[in-house]
């Protein structure tokens, strides 16, 4: 069995780098919606992890129970963050398996 030559290895590395950059661009361009309280609190994260929007249904705003509202906001953020991580894994995960093990990144 012959060893791959340096040109093949470099071409593979360049393809992988391009695919990685494309996957990163897709993730950054995404908006992820997280929800809590059956949609009473929604939070939108950018693909870069920044909060873009927060909506709170008036029904869950109770001055006597601020703690519940805080929990709902945290829950919506955690939901959006998990979805963002899942998206990143979906887009970037396959890149680690390219080329019979790929290159370490």
From Swiss-Prot:
Keyword Cytoplasm: yes
Molecular function as annotated in GO: DNA binding
Entry annotated with the keyword Coiled coil: no
Cellular component GO terms, alphabetical: bacterial nucleoid; cytosol
Alphabetized InterPro entries for the sequence: YbaB-like_sf, YbaB/EbfC
Pfam families on file: YbaB_DNA_bd (PF02575)
Predominant location: cytoplasm
Keywords tagged on the record: Cytoplasm, DNA-binding
Compartment annotation: Cytoplasm, Nucleoid
Quaternary structure note: Homodimer.
Function per UniProt: Binds to DNA and alters its conformation. May be involved in regulation of gene expression, nucleoid organization and DNA protection.
Family: Belongs to the YbaB/EbfC family.
Name of the protein this chain belongs to: Nucleoid-associated protein cu1912
